[in-house]
């Protein structure tokens, strides 16, 4: 538990910042939550720079919420829609489902703004959290005796405040992180991916669809992908029957899409069925008028300052591209892991923060790399016959040797008890086995039935011990 009167400043009232504020308040700390933006729940608030890809919340994110409060998790997730797999749309418009889980597991689509506002409502209901919007962190002094001195810009003036410690949840361009670098030797790197994203919109249908159980034009139980090798379109369902659709492609592609005619030809050639849903004119207007977002990764280490003065969570510590759907899930897991360490060390921030950096780094590096790698999987491998056959075999082994063989996606998305780095290690070992299995299948099949299956099982166990 926090010491009586101990204060924490949480910088950033996004998803991770809100959950961190709720978690610290539950442990007895006096929490101040700051954000440079206006309160997004206000009707007058319009953020033209806010461009978000719909969220896919899975086991790690859900467990992060539950670790703070089971009932809170149920309340803030009431608007999510389960997606049981991908729906692949080929050039001809044919749709092919690909299940996510081995046994019917699903990831869940939820609107970022809806979830953020739900968490802010929870924050507002807490006696020990004070949320202050329109406060932009300008400077921090982490050598100010027993407290940390923060300078905020507020309505053209500066305000100086002091806290026992600081939690930076202010995103990829974190000011908290920049200020921490002034006081410790923090390694830092950022990498822009040669890929932009652009949001599009599939409206709900005018009439209720009996087939889909609502005003949905396409299945709401799938994440839809139009993979076209070096570019792609995706769509995630919303509760109102609409879909948030996002186009991803290399920046150089824009050079070939200058005119309306070029855009029309490109979109109708590559996404004919999607244009029937979005509307060709709407898609062209979006390409011509909407801001294109950049995708970047951030890595740093350590994530904390000595003495328990400050720590980074979420994108401030590990921004990643969205192709594994783990950005928010990983950030919520950050909160759960940190709270567990504070329990383990009886509230000793110095020890808990140091252990967090030491134990969490491998996981964060692993998921950042997995997210980058998964772009090719979504845009290309999902239509590759070789990779589909390999994936099918992987899933067969997973179902046959339940609990012994786990596909990578299962470990990352549905097994919050398996750290990211451990999932990568297991996957590498299984990939080597899978390569041998593919070579051996014909000879094993000749043995037939149960005998072949038993031999395969014994052989896998033997290889896994190597």
Curated annotation (Swiss-Prot):
One of its GO terms (molecular function) is kynurenine 3-monooxygenase activity. SUPFAM superfamilies: FAD/NAD(P)-binding domain (SSF51905). Keywords: FAD, Flavoprotein, Membrane, Mitochondrion, Mitochondrion outer membrane, Monooxygenase, NADP, Oxidoreductase, Pyridine nucleotide biosynthesis. GO terms for biological process: 'de novo' NAD biosynthetic process from L-tryptophan; anthranilate metabolic process; kynurenine metabolic process; L-tryptophan catabolic process; quinolinate biosynthetic process. Its cofactor is FAD. Pfam families: FAD_binding_3. It is an enzyme of class 1 (oxidoreductase). One of its GO terms (cellular component) is mitochondrial outer membrane. Its EC number is 1.14.13.9. It catalyses: L-kynurenine + NADPH + O2 + H(+) = 3-hydroxy-L-kynurenine + NADP(+) + H2O. Catalyzes the hydroxylation of L-kynurenine (L-Kyn) to form 3-hydroxy-L-kynurenine (L-3OHKyn). Required for synthesis of quinolinic acid. This is Kynurenine 3-monooxygenase.
């Amino acid at each position: 538990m926090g010491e009586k009167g101990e204060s924490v400043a949480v910088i950033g009232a996004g998803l991770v910042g809100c959950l961190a504020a709720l978690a610290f308040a539950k442990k007895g700390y006096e929490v101040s939550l700051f954000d440079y933006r206006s309160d997004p729940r206000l009707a007058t608030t319009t953020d033209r720079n806010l461009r978000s890809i719909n969220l896919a919340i899975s086991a790690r994110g859900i467990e992060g919420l539950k670790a703070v409060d089971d009932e809170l998790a149920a309340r803030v997730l009431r608007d999510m829609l389960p997606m049981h797999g991908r729906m692949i749309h080929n050039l001809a418009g044919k749709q092919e489902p690909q299940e996510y889980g081995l046994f019917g597991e699903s990831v869940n689509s939820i609107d970022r703004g809806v979830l953020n506002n739900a968490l802010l409502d929870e924050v507002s209901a807490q006696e020990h959290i004070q949320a202050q919007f329109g406060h932009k962190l300008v400077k921090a002094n982490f050598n100010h005796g027993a407290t940390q001195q923060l300078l905020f810009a507020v309505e053209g003036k500066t305000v100086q405040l002091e806290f026992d410690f600081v939690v930076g949840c202010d995103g990829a361009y974190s000011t908290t992180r920049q200020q921490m670098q002034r006081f410790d030797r923090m390694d830092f790197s950022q990498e822009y991916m040669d890929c932009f994203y652009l949001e599009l919109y599939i409206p709900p249908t005018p009439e209720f669809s009996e087939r889909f159980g609502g005003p949905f034009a396409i299945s709401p139980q799938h994440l839809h992908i139009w993979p076209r090798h070096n570019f792609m379109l995706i769509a995630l369902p919303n509760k109102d029957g609409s879909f948030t659709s996002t186009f991803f492609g290399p920046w150089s592609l824009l050079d070939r899409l200058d005119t309306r005619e070029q855009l029309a030809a490109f979109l109708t050639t590559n996404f004919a069925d999607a244009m029937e849903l979005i509307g060709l004119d709407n898609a062209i207007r979006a390409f011509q008028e909407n801001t294109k977002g950049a995708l970047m990764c951030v890595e740093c280490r350590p994530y904390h300052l000595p003495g328990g003065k400050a720590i980074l969570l979420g994108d401030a510590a590990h921004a990643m591209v969205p192709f594994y759907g783990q950005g928010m899930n990983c950030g919520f897991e950050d909160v759960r892991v940190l709270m567990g360490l504070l329990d383990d060390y009886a509230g000793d921030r110095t020890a808990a923060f140091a252990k967090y950096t030491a134990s969490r780094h491998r996981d964060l590096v692993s998921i950042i790399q997995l997210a980058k790698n998964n772009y090719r999987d979504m845009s290309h491998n999902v239509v590759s016959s070789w990779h589909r056959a390999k994936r099918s075999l992987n899933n067969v082994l997973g179902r046959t040797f339940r609990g012994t063989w786990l596909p990578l996606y299962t470990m990352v998305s549905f097994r919050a008890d398996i750290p990211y780095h451990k999932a990568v290690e297991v996957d590498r070992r299984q990939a080597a086995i899978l390569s041998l299995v593919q070579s051996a299948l014909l000879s094993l099949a000749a043995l037939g039935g149960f005998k072949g299956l038993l031999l395969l099982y014994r052989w896998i166990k033997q290889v896994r011990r190597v």
